[in-house]
């Protein structure tokens, strides 16, 4: 299946082209978008190094705005960051005219940096539309185009068959939980890894393993926690005829079977966070996940892969693909870098009508920019053992190891 491209099938005569097609193809509109992108380039190019506030007056105005933001929100922003609306790759200008280096990228949301011309163009093109926010009751072409693009990438090495968009990562997780509950009703328990993070709705705050995120909340979700892979513990366990890794995995399997035997038929899903971010940048070998997923398959427990934070950021677009687990996943959640979030699922997990809805699935610019992001990732030199992500990872880890060697303990 190829990505939808209405331009490729447009009739040649204007009489048989929609007004929408004619507007988007208008020379005046195309020239205006070109001019906008070029103007962004010109101003963005001037931001090439960090600098302080441009004046005491701007700094004072910035501080006052931060204070006002905190008063309105009920708490100050996590960081004293109010952007001016322009940047240049890793450089971003703040409201006071100072320029900072962005090492956070909104936790992967702004993967391509600030004022990326291709994304500015995609957002400008998205503004040529009759509505701002799309949903299942009023949908233009963009949601289906983005969904198909995501699904085509996911289907390359998995059994995933459907993609359902939503407007936040935690909503993707909520949708995934409902899909798993419905498929395995009346099972009501959930298995998750220790130190996982799921989002901040009332249900996801209960599943996420952070007590501070559920203070004062009534507890209604039954969660059993599994230990995530611990390389240091595995190394300590290495002895005799079995490696430490194998021993650790065997212990984890025993723990999982203890849960499934204690609560037979009561678990709807096991949430696999293949790389833990909030929990401390924890990783695990493929064998660890595969063995646990095999137990889940035997016990008829859904294998749910939460990639809201990791999507697009490993050596392949999907972390399940990087780890060779495409044959095991039943449900996958993505977000952040994709701009619009989504749940993907196999045909066996396609829910009954009424369970999911998309009244407010995403804005035009998020849908358009998300599509461009995935196109750039899919066609650029980003993936594989020699791709840009792998090369950057090696540079980073080499420096970390050098620092650790220089400052042991």
Predicted regions, residues:
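Conserved N-terminal phosphate-binding loop of PLP-dependent enzymes in the Aspartate aminotransferase
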Residues: 2-409
């Amino acid at each position: 299946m190829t990505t939808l491209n209405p331009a490729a099938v447009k009739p040649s005569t204007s009489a048989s082209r929609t007004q929408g097609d004619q507007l988007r193809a208008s020379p005046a509109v195309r020239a205006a978008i070109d001019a906008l992108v070029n103007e962004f380039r010109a101003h963005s190019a001037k931001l090439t190094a960090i600098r302080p506030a441009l004046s005491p007056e701007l700094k004072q105005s910035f501080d006052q705005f931060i204070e006002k933001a905190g008063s309105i929100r009920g708490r100050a922003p996590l960081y004293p960051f109010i952007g001016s609306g322009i940047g240049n790759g890793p450089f971003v200008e703040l409201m006071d005219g100072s320029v900072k280096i962005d090492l956070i990228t909104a936790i992967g949301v702004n993967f391509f940096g600030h004022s990326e011309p291709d994304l500015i163009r995609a957002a400008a093109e998205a503004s040529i539309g009759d509505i701002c926010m799309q949903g299942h009751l009023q949908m233009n072409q963009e949601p289906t185009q983005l969904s198909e693009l995501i699904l085509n990438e996911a289907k390359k090495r998995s059994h995933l068959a459907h993609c359902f968009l939503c407007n936040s990562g935690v909503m993707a997780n909520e949708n995934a939980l409902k899909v798993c509950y419905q498929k395995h009703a009346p099972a009501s328990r959930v298995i998750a890894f220790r130190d996982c993070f799921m989002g901040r709705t009332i249900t996801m705050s209960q599943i996420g393993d952070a007590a501070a995120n559920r203070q004062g909340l009534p507890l209604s979700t039954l969660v059993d926690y599994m230990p995530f892979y611990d390389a240091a513990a595995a190394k300590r366990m290495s002895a005799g005829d079995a490696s430490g890794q194998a021993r650790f995995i065997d212990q984890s399997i025993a723990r999982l079977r203890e849960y499934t035997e204690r609560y037979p038929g009561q678990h709807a899903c096991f949430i696999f966070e293949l790389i833990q971010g909030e929990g401390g940048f924890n990783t695990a070998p493929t064998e660890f996940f595969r063995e646990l997923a095999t137990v889940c398959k035997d016990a008829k427990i859904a294998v749910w892969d939460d990639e809201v934070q990791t999507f697009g950021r490993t050596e392949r677009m999907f972390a399940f693909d990087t780890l060779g687990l495409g044959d095991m996943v039943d449900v996958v959640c993505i977000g952040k870098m994709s701009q619009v979030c989504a749940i993907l699922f196999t045909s066996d997990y396609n829910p009954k009508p009424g369970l999911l809805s998309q009244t407010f699935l995403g804005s035009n610019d998020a849908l358009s920019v998300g599509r461009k992001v995935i196109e750039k990732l899919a066609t650029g030199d980003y993936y594989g053992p020699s791709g840009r992500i792998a090369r950057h990872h090696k540079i980073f880890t080499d420096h970390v190891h050098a620092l650790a060697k220089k400052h042991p303990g």
